[in-house]
A protein has these predicted regions:
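Alpha-helical repeat scaffolds
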Residues: 61-66, 97-103, 131-143, 167-179, ...
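N-terminal leader/linker segments that initiate helical-solenoid repeat arrays
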Residues: 29-82
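Flexible helix-coil transition and linker loops at the boundaries of alpha-helical arrays
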Residues: 65-73, 105-112, 144, 183
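Alpha-helical adaptor scaffolds
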Residues: 85-150
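Bacterial N-terminal signal peptides
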Residues: 15-26
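Boundary/linker segments of alpha-helical solenoid repeat arrays
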Residues: 109-114, 145-153, 178-192
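Terminal, low-structured helical/coil segments at or just beyond the last alpha-helical repeat
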Residues: 178-220
């Protein structure tokens, strides 16, 4: 327990500097990063596009368990990412950014682990309201994989609609429908297709679906 407390203290001491560095990176380029070119189809499964969970979220000693996992090494990366998510959810974004900076610096975006870090970071940023920064992380995760990951169209559509870039959102949603029309042609299966999304996020995507259905864009 004492070791875990010391580890948390060390992470917290580093939070200020890392947060400042990441904020500067976001201000001077990440937010303006363009999205990859829209493709016709997105059939490729990306095993990295899943929440990184080591300890069940309802555990009473969640933070202590995650700190122990970080120290043991075998699941240190997953534990670091989950701990970052806990920090964001508890209103401690500076600590969350520090932990994600640590996880990002230890992985390459061309690896499954690196893509997973950036995919998860994107979701935590999105839920913090930093949608442009979330898109930058997701774009990096997408670029690290050969092929066209199936998670991309709906995720980008959600983010772009949230930013008010509704025409672009519909274009990305159309790619999801072209790829799997039985899945994305309506919003009826969202709970099954998007189990890790919040109800509010699925509701936003349903707005995109309605806009797509009202005027489906042609390809190309």
């Amino acid at each position: 327990m004492a070791v875990a407390r010391q580890g948390r203290a060390g992470v917290m001491r580093a939070a200020g500097l890392a947060a400042a560095l990441i904020a500067a990176m976001t201000t001077f380029g990440l937010a303006a990063q363009p999205l990859p070119a829209l493709q016709e189809f997105y059939f490729d499964t990306d095993p990295a596009a899943v929440p990184m969970v080591v300890v069940p979220a309802g555990s009473g000693d969640l933070v202590d368990q995650l700190m122990k996992q970080r120290e043991r090494g075998r699941k240190a990366l997953d534990a670091t990412v989950q701990l970052a998510g806990v920090a964001f959810s508890q209103g401690r974004p500076e600590l969350g950014r520090t932990l994600y900076a640590e996880a990002s610096s230890s992985t390459q975006p061309t690896t499954a682990a690196g893509r997973a870090v950036r995919w998860n970071y994107g979701w935590d940023l999105f839920r913090l309201g930093e949608v442009e920064a979330a898109l930058a992380q997701w774009s990096t995760a997408q670029g690290g994989m050969r092929g066209n990951p199936s998670w991309v169209p709906a995720t980008y559509a959600l983010a772009l609609w949230t930013l008010g870039r509704k025409d672009e959102a519909v274009q990305w949603y159309a790619a999801a429908v072209r790829t799997e029309p039985q899945q994305w042609g309506s919003s009826a299966r969202y709970a099954d297709l998007l189990p890790s999304w919040r109800d509010s996020e699925r509701a936003t995507l349903a707005e995109v679906q309605k806009a797509w259905a009202a005027q489906p864009p042609a390809w190309p």
